[in-house]
Amino acid sequence: MPKRLPRARTLKGDPKLAHYDLGGGGTGEPPILLLHQSLARSEDWENIFPRLATRYRTVAYDARGHGKSGRAPDYSLRGFADDALRMLREIVKEPALLVGHSLGALAALIAAGDAPDLVRGLVLEDPALGYAKAWDPAQYASLREGIASTEPAVLAKAVSKFPLPSPGPHGERTYGELRGFYAAERVVTYFRDVDPAFIDARTAGDAPAAALITDALGKVKAPVLVLAGEPRLGGQVDDSAEWRLKKLADVTVKRFPGSGHLLHGFRPEQFIENIEPFLRKLRES
């Protein structure tokens, strides 16, 4: 099991945001803010956080309606981006590198477009540019029932059968087949604290998100590193998405051959190896 995160702290507000911050960091090094994917929590960075924190001030936080953060009446992409801005302004308090996965990548992208003075650079892990599209309610019905249930066994069963967003290292298709970082008994701790209303919001879709994403792609001037999986394995950056991302002012796209959507979870060493040169470039700029 990876090293645990530091003790959670709370940023008061609406909603409250649980965050994890070891402080420190080398002189002249940018702080790093980690933004997790949908249905996860800050523990999803446990295999990355300690490695980054040896050199950089590293901060992670639970998105609204996830983990230890508060629930909210609004689960639009705009709301998630506003929370990223709150973290930058009230906790990080200096220009940072934002590292976001999937939903977290989109929140980071929009925050960077809205507040360029707060962002040194972006690492976007398999950003889901098609976020506006609604999730399939049938695919998430059992999981939602499990999250809402007061019986832990109901959620455990739903998680064990829930399909992975991309195949595991040995071709696994469900969380129940996995061992290690994304084993079902670990992922249960992610899902159990998700607000069922978040799933309701995603199955309804988020039409305004499309314009938000397009607008941000035109506004962001900071350097951007996109880490992408293979679309055939569940990666979200297909040819059309890559074409859109390459309209960013300063962007590099790197593929993870043989990987899908869960890059840092399944390939932490490769993930770190890819972002370290990007961080050196930021230091020298």
Predicted regions mapped to residue ranges:
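N-terminal cap/lid segment of alpha/beta-hydrolase-fold proteins
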Residues: 1-16
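Active-site loop/oxyanion-hole signature of alpha/beta-hydrolase fold enzymes
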Residues: 21-23, 49-50, 59-99, 103, ...
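Hydrolases whose catalytic domains are alpha/beta-hydrolase-1, hotdog thioesterase
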Residues: 107-111
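Flexible "cap/lid" loop of the alpha/beta hydrolase fold
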Residues: 113, 120-156
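Conserved loop-alpha-helix segment in the C-terminal half of the alpha/beta-hydrolase fold
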Residues: 50, 219-259
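Conserved HGGG/HGGXW glycine-rich cap/lid loop of the alpha/beta-hydrolase fold
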Residues: 18-70, 279
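Catalytic histidine-centered segment of alpha/beta-hydrolase-like enzymes
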Residues: 259-268, 272
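Conserved alpha/beta-hydrolase catalytic His-Asp/Glu region
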Residues: 132-138, 152-218
